[in-house]
Amino acid sequence: MKPWLRKLNQWTKTIWPALIWSAFVFVLLIIPSSKLPNETLVPIPYFDKIVHLILFGGFAFFWDQYLSLQKGFFLKAYRYGFVILLIIVYGLLIEYLQVSVGRKFELMDLLADITGGIFMLKKIPGKIGRDRS
């Protein structure tokens, strides 16, 4: 394996990918409404909910990836439930903070966050595309 690839592989096993993705999600979802375009850029119904599904699917993937590699992590056996709890808490926090920047708390956004996370946890672990059941 090439040295740069080995370093990248080691880096992906750290907490940094999960933290960077979490920060990315936060920045995208906390943008003040005055900075958002009035017209949707993509004429797809519920496009904002699709964005939430994708962002929190990534959130679930990166946090599950990190937690699955932790030796001795006391919640390792329950990491899927723990990741879902993280999604709920983080989604609630973001929705609550959006009010302070002129946006609205939307329950449907929170449901899209949770759905995206659960879908990713169901589909990704092990081999891509293979159900856990």
Describe the function of each predicted region.
Residues I54-Q70, G117-I128:
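Membrane-interfacial alpha-helical segments at the cytosolic side of multi-pass membrane proteins
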